[in-house]
Amino acid sequence: MSKEVSEEPEHVRPKDYTDPPPAPLFDVGELRLWSFYRALIAEFIATLLFLYITVATVIGYKVQSSADQCGGVGTLGIAWAFGGMIFILVYCTAGISGGHINPAVTFGLLLARKVSVIRAVMYIVAQCLGGIVGVGIVKGIMKHQYNANGGGANMVASGYSTGTALGAEIIGTFVLVYTVFSATDPKRNARDSHVPVLAPLPIGFAVFMVHLATIPITGTGINPARSIGAAVIYNQKKAWDDHWIFWAGPFIGALAAAAYHQYILRAAAIKALGSFRSNPSN
């Protein structure tokens, strides 16, 4: 007698994470919540502190005239100041506002339906105001040095074209926003939730690396709040000549990163899972 062999179908392991539902495009109900205004305050203060520390570092470095190699922090130190502050501030504010601290990041998350239009617009306003106030404090503390050393404003460096500067801003912001999406992915969060620094750390390190690459080209914008804060307070023609680059570049970079992560990486993973389930040989 032949014995029938019946194989039980393999069970696909359930997901150990949950994708959050898309944020509504217009959520007027947010305007009635204290948590919404608390998040705006957090974004304002975080961007203020970010611009105060980083622009003060830039001005302090430029003031140094000593021949001693240890007389100033140098490009490496400036990059650490920007990356380190993002690490600290994202860590401090992630649970309150999401720790955007950058209109380009907010724009990318809006495109991915992580935040509503109302929240995105209000975040960007709060970030820009925070940037202006932060740079204003720097000018108030070190006015002579501030005016004499370019005010920490983003400008296209001599020897570089507008197109090169725009490309640097697009690629730099792509790196940052792509890192934000990857570090805050629900799947990653579910498995790394016991290590709370794992999201802020790569985001801060991405900012550090981008600054190393692009400080010689544009002074590194990748954050329109940083750029407009310095431009408004410095308020010289050369700070405004190519200012559009520091809005267009970051927003294009954020758009590209959002599309890449949401519609290529995440969509590819969903498609692969569907193919696996529908294949009878698996």
UniProtKB/Swiss-Prot annotation:
Induction: Down-regulated by chilling.
GO molecular function: water channel activity
Keywords assigned: Cell membrane, Membrane, Repeat, Transmembrane, Transmembrane helix, Transport
Tissue: Expressed in roots and leaves.
Motif NPA 2 per record, residues: 223-225
Name of protein: Probable aquaporin PIP2-6
InterPro entries: Aquaporin-like (IPR023271), Aquaporin_transptr (IPR034294), MIP (IPR000425), MIP_CS (IPR022357)
Main location (coarse class): membrane
Listed GO CC annotations: plasma membrane
